Amino acid sequence: MKQGIHPDFQKVVFMDSATGAKFVAGSTMKPEETIEYEGETYPLVRVEVSSDSHPFYTGKQKFAQADGRIEKFNKKYGLKK
């Protein structure tokens, strides 16, 4: 491999925003936020959907609190249903 062209690989904590579940995985992402997890400090990456909240993996429907693009547009421009 050539030196200096590959991104740094590190362990990060991914946190599901819908359920609050956390898991450690390797990534090249470089988030600004950090978190204390299992006695060590890791960079934190927040995700809207993970295997903990996705209906395919859970087998049941869960409703996430995140607004979609249409709701954000309607809030911004004051449109009502």
Curated annotation (Swiss-Prot):
GO MF terms, alphabetically ordered: structural constituent of ribosome
Keyword Ribonucleoprotein attributed: yes
Cellular component, GO, one term: ribonucleoprotein complex
Alphabetic keyword roster: Ribonucleoprotein, Ribosomal protein
InterPro entries linked to this entry: Ribosomal_bL28/bL31-like_sf (IPR034704), Ribosomal_bL31 (IPR002150), Ribosomal_bL31_B (IPR027493), Ribosomal_bL31_sf (IPR042105)
Record carries keyword Nucleotide-binding: no
Any coiled-coil regions, as ranges: none
Biological process annotations from GO: translation
Subunit structure: Part of the 50S ribosomal subunit.
Family named by the database record: Belongs to the bacterial ribosomal protein bL31 family. Type B subfamily.
Annotated protein name in UniProt: Large ribosomal subunit protein bL31B
Organism: Lactobacillus acidophilus (strain ATCC 700396 / NCK56 / N2 / NCFM)
GN (gene name): rpmE2
